[in-house]
C-alpha cells in the first residue's frame, strides 16, 4: 500500500464470511526460489534463550500478497519468529529483510518506521483497556494524520463492519468475548494501512465456529486489501483455509517449507505425526 491517506470509499463491506459464498481455501502456490521481490526474507536465522536454542539456521521467504502459515509443536519458535520480524527480539545470527531492507541491525527509530508497514495482531488483542472499540481502531489513524475527523469516523465504521464488530463500537474491550476482541484487534491493525499483517495464534481459546469466522475475516480482508500475511497457528483446519505456503518448524529447524497440499500429502514421519495430533489439544506457543 502507498503512503496516501486511507480512502474510506475504498473499503468495501464483505459478505458474511461464514455464509455459503465464503472464500474458498487459498490455491496452492509453490514458493519461487530467488523471487526478486519477496516481502519478507529470513536467511539462516538462529536465536537462543540462554542455553536453549529456539531457532537454528531457519530460512524462508514470503511473496508479496501471499499467506504463510507457520506450524509446529509447542516451543519450536513460531511466535518468536514474529517477534523478531517486528524487531522486538534480535537473532543471534542470520538476517531478516522487509522489502529488501535488512532490519536486524536497525535502531529503534528505524524499526518504528518498519512497524508502520508491518503490524501484529497479538493473542490478547493488545487493545487499550481505557478506550472504546471505536477509539482503539481510530488510534492509528489519528497518530498517522492526514484525515479529517469525519473521515476517521467513516473509516472506523467501515473497518468495524469488515470484521463484523460494528455493533460494539462504544463498548470497552473488557466487555467483549475473546473472539470479538480478536476481530477488533484485526480492525485496528488494518487502520494502520500495513503492507504485512502478522497474526499470533488468532484461534487460541475460541471455539471452532468463531475460529471459522475469524479465518473468513482474515482471508477476505487479505483478498480485498492485498496485504501479505504470516499466521502462527496450531489449528490445521484454520491453516488449510488460509495458507498459500506452510513453514513447519521442528526441533528449532525449518523441517518443511512449501505448498499446503504438499505438506498435507507428505509421508515424512515427523509431519505425519504432527498431522495426526489433535490440533485443538495442542498447547499454546
Label each residue range with its predicted role.
Residues 131-139:
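Short coil-to-helix segment of the ABC ATPase nucleotide-binding domain corresponding to the Q-loop/switch region
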Residues 193:
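Conserved catalytic motifs of ABC-family nucleotide-binding domains
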Residues 197-200:
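Catalytic Walker B motif of ABC-type/P-loop ATPase nucleotide-binding domains
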Residues 103-119, 143, 149, 263-267:
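ABC ATPase NBD coupling module
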Residues 86:
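Helix-to-loop junction immediately C-terminal to a conserved catalytic motif
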